[in-house]
Amino acid sequence: MSDSALLNCRQLVTLAGPPGPRTGPAMRELAIIPDGAMRIRDGCIAAVGPRADIVRSLAGDTEVIDAGWRVVLPGFIDAHTHPVFAGTRAAEYEQRAEGATYAEIAAAGGGIRSTVRRTREAGDLELATAARRYTDWFLRGGTTTIEAKSGYGLSLDDELRILKTIRLLNAERRLRYVPTFLGAHEIPDEYRGEIEDYVDLVIQEMLPAVAEDNLAEYCDVFCEPNVFPLDPARAILQAAQSLGLRLRIHADQFTGDYAALLAAELGAATADHLESTTALGLAALHEAGVQPVLLPASVYNLGSARYPAARDMIARGMAVVLATDFNPGSSPTASIPMVLSLASTQMKMTPAESITAVTVNAAHSLGRGSRIGSLEPGKAADFAIHECDDYRELAYFFGREPANAVYLAGQCVYRRSA
């Protein structure tokens, strides 16, 4: 057995509490231990408490992890990312700065389809190398788990290739990856005007191959009238359910109450985006127990002012989740701290609510609430030591990489260079 102890934490932000996702006022309860400490055994948390209590229980040969009187939080859980792709869309970023809209660029063959073309051309090594670079970006912000979508292949072979890259990255044990199949991200060039044929490909070939090799836990669909309308989206998601995959849905990014109602109907784990969802859609999601995953960085990067109604969701008792939506087009950021800042300034979530949304609530949205998301005995020792004096500074000092060191299952996977 390997034993270690984390000591000298100015604030140990544990988020300890009752099982289940947090809602309402409970989202502000972080269970902070000043001068806290933690004992770790074989990659799991063995004990948490005041430093004096933990020190008394240590054996003489216990390895000490010195937090240096910094703030320690659970590793952030980013519940919506697209981390495997080739190239960038910096040219499109410039086009948007000159006045072009996201929809106009997509209609001209850019957007998701441009990344699909570049990704199909890339070799396996190129894809894995790029994704490892992004792994470093996630770690620098204190993230230890990401939900990782495919969606830039849009052919049987290329979707499987992306999911196998995600499996490879997960096996490297620097970051935890939760794989999601997103073959219904866009209609590829060769199927333009033939959506029924492409949906058949997704249902008849892609999904069975994904399920046979256990390459994904979830299936997602970008459900919008001009991408995958309700009937094709429903058919894909029901086929995924029949194969044992759980559901996540890109919902109501542009069209109100379009996909939120579908997410509620099918009992999806999450409905993501929700920028255009009205009270009708929110009521349906709440009643069905679907967790909202809000992506303020994509709203910011697209130059929109339509942020999701986070305060309304919290008032309704919904277990809100925040995520980066890391992707090469609408949200090229892997920074959860930046998302925390946007959540406070643009959606008026408190720093405590935002922390809950990227830890405990995010863990439950991925079916991992009993294993990660808080610093409690029995859970994985996934945590980050941050360069700050108070957890609120993670959102307050925006645009920085706060993590001094990041640990996954008790092992250091990132340390800031001196």
From Swiss-Prot:
Pfam families cross-referenced by the UniProt entry: Amidohydro_1
Protein keywords: Cytoplasm, Histidine metabolism, Hydrolase, Iron, Metal-binding, Zinc
Pathway named in the protein's UniProt entry: Amino-acid degradation; L-histidine degradation into L-glutamate; N-formimidoyl-L-glutamate from L-histidine: step 3/3
Cofactor comment: Binds 1 zinc or iron ion per subunit.
SUPFAM superfamilies in alphabetical order: Composite domain of metallo-dependent hydrolases (SSF51338), Metallo-dependent hydrolases (SSF51556)
Compartment annotation: Cytoplasm
Recorded GO CC terms: cytoplasm
A molecular function (GO) term: iron ion binding
Binding site for Fe(3+): 80, 82, 250, 325
Residues reported in the UniProt entry to bind N-formimidoyl-L-glutamate: 152, 327, 329
HAMAP family tied to this protein: HutI
EC number: 3.5.2.7
Gene3D superfamilies with a match to the protein in the record: Metal-dependent hydrolases, Urease, subunit C, domain 1
Protein's name in the database: Imidazolonepropionase
Cofactor(s) essential for the protein: Zn(2+); Fe(3+)
Purpose of the protein: Catalyzes the hydrolytic cleavage of the carbon-nitrogen bond in imidazolone-5-propanoate to yield N-formimidoyl-L-glutamate. It is the third step in the universal histidine degradation pathway.
UniProt binding sites for Zn(2+): 80, 82, 250, 325
Family: Belongs to the metallo-dependent hydrolases superfamily. HutI family.
Reaction(s) catalysed (UniProt annotation): 4-imidazolone-5-propanoate + H2O = N-formimidoyl-L-glutamate
Primary location recorded for the protein, binned into one broad class: cytoplasm
Classification of source organism: Bacteria, Pseudomonadati, Acidobacteriota, Terriglobia, Bryobacterales
Enzyme class: hydrolase
GO biological process: L-histidine catabolic process to glutamate and formamide; L-histidine catabolic process to glutamate and formate
Positions that bind 4-imidazolone-5-propanoate: 89, 152, 185, 253, 330
